[in-house]
Amino acid sequence: MEPFRPQYHYTPEKNWMNDPNGMVFYEGEYHLFYQYNPAGDKWGHMSWGHAVSPDMVHWTHLPLALAEADNVMIFSGSALVDWKNSSGFGKDGRPPLVAIYTGFRTTDRVQFQCIAYSNDKGRTWTKYSGNPVIDINSRDFRDPKVQWHDATRRWIMTVSLSAEHKVRFYGSDNLKAWTLLSEFGPAGATGGVWECPDLFELPLPGTNDKRWVLVVNMNPGSVAGGSGGQYFIGRFDGTQFVAERDSLIPPRPGRSASESAHWFDYGPDYYAAVSWSDVPVSDGRRLWLGWMSNWEYGGDVPTSPWRSAMSIPREVGLSRTAEGIRLVQKPAREMESLRDRHFAFKSGDVSEANAWLKERHVQGDQLELMVEFAPRSSGTEGVKVLKSDTEATVIGVDRQRGRAFVDRTQSGNVTFHQKFSGVYDAPLAVHDGRVKLHLFVDASSVEVFVNDGERVFTSLVYPSAASRGVELFGSMTSARITSLNVWTLKSIWK
């Protein structure tokens, strides 16, 4: 029995997994590589595990892609399709897949950038004989994300100088020889090391304009404690990233973590988020996922024989808010393919909705739930999931304080690590008074999208087998629900 095995999130069959790596789309397949320990369920012997999917939802496990060798571990990085064979690694007129990763030499702990290539759709890989391609003799230089920049006709590498809270940009014509272009940082939150950067352009809704987003994952010191991720919005000319003024928050003594940066997830368990390369232009989406865990307790979570899962795939976009341009996320539409039984409640107050839920036996640990609360001026409302008489994970909005929150203090096993139990909140401007919550509940996780992804929370939970209930709550009898939809979700493994 594997009581906490997620049924629609990617997990390795066994052993330790952390950051998603090398995410690339090629010939109908989404590739997911990931930090993997082939030898055990704790961090170590870092190599790249591998899985492929036609839809980012249903995954096929593949053999280890890049293995630790000669005292060099394979740390995080990216992958791409070298369409014009600029690297010369192509074969028989077909473009190679090229992986760009950090090598970590265990003897002196120096980190450097390396490349490898594949001529068989990522099934087997050859490490480049000229590695490393960048070596600055640093112990904190990692996680290269590489993309083609059309305007300057060259490859751009975004890579972190982790301990200096900087991101470096390098340029190359052939993926082998690299030139330093510029640096960004320190900026935003600097309470931990900067890791797993990403850089991508997104359209600005309602205009013909675009903005660049620089993503920086950070550990520890993030908004929910431990690992998390921030972003900057600005412009990139192929050489330098310049953040817009309202994207930079000047440091101030006494400022809380939540106020010190723009965070893309306010829960404790969404880290190392990076986006897929080479998604077809005809699709047009920027898609990503993250490691659903936290370095504070990731090695202690009560699961066996595997440790860690990936989040669901998400689409990221920009939105104009009262505070400025902000990043929003929503579940990738492919998640709808998992919907099974559907329960729809039209409208009514909280007690009517709860009676309806009970009457129809709406419960489970594989659920998608969407609820909208009607406008009102004050009070707290939300939903409890994975509920029993003694346990529940509580998701809600406190209108008085202008905060959305997730409370896992009574979610089940919270004692396996002293830093696991907690309440996590985020500022929320309730514009027209309506509040929308969109939840994905799996065997050991809850992902929450508030008000169309304006705020997102990702949280691990370890409930008892009996904790399967769903219940709405409101602090005032006037709390009304304008719509409620619940779906049971199918397993991706059956």
Where in this protein do the model-derived segments appear?
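Beta-rich accessory regions
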Residues: 206, 229-494
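Beta-rich carbohydrate-recognition and catalytic domains
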Residues: 1-144, 148-194, 203-266, 281-283, ...
